[in-house]
Amino acid sequence: MSLRIAVLLTNDDTSAFAAHFPNDGQKVVQLLQPLRPDWSFEVLSVKDGVLPRDPHAFDGHVITGSPASVNDDVLPWVGPLLDFIRAVDAARQPLIGLCFGHQAVARALGGQVKCNAAGWGLGTAPTHWQHTRPWMQPAQSTTTLMAAHNEQVTRMPEGAECLGGSDFCPIGSMQIGQHIWTTQFHPEMSLVFMQALLGYLADKLDADTMARAHTSLNNAADVPLFGQWMVQFFENARTTNP
C-alpha cells in the first residue's frame, strides 16, 4: 500500500530561531518517510493559504503544530483550515492532528480549546492510554513525547473518544470514527530541538516553568514508536475506509 500524505504546515514562526531548523512539515516527513520509503509526502503551507484542492486529493493528512491559536480568527488561514477539517471529516478521509492540529480538529468539529489554567506544558509529557487501537503496535500503556503548549482541548466534539491523557492534560489524544486521530504532543520534535527551544524561551517564561521543562527531559521521548503508530494508523484507516 503506497500512500500520498499531505502535511499541512501551520507553524507561522518566522523568527531567527525557527530558521535554524527544518520547518514542522519537514520534521513530520523526516519522521515518517524512513518508515514507509515508498510513500510520498507533500508539505502544504496552510499559513500561506495553501490547502489540498479537496478532501480526496491525498490518501491522508497530518496537521502540524503551531505557535498560533486555533481561536485566533484574525489569522486569515485559520477559518479555511477549519472548513477543510470539516470536509475531511464528512468525507471520512484519514487525518492526524498534532498539538495545534489536535486543537484545530476539536474546534472545527464543535469542541472547545482554552488556555490551560496550570500554565505551559513544556519539555516532555506523558500520555496514559486508556484505550488501545489496532494501529498501536507495539503496544505501550504510556508514551512520552515533547510538549510545547499553553492551550489545550477542554471539551471534545460530539462523537469523539478520548484515548488517553494525564492529570495535566486530560484530553491528550482523541479518536473520531476510524479516520481521525489526534495528539496534543509532538512526535516530530527531537531532544536537540527541544533543548534549543528551551534556551530560546529562557528569558520569555518564568523560572519554575523552565526548571520543570528541563527536568522533564530526563524522560526519553517515544519518537520512533509514535512514528510507527502514525503510519499504521493511516494503513488501518485506508483499509477501514477505502
Model regions and ranges:
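N-terminal beta1-alpha1 cap of cysteine-dependent amidohydrolase-like domains
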Residues: 1-83, 87-91, 211-242
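Hydrophobic/aromatic beta-strand patches that form the interior of the parallel beta-sheet core
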Residues: 6-8, 42-44, 62, 96, ...
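Flexible, glycine-rich phosphate/dinucleotide-binding loops
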Residues: 14, 50, 70, 104, ...
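Short glycine-/acidic-enriched loop or helix-start segments at secondary-structure transitions
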Residues: 17-18, 53, 72-73, 106-108, ...
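Short, glycine/charged-enriched secondary-structure capping and boundary segments
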Residues: 20-23, 56-58, 75-78, 110-113, ...
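Cysteine-nucleophile active-site neighborhood
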Residues: 66-131
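Pocket-forming structural segment of enzyme catalytic cores
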Residues: 109-192
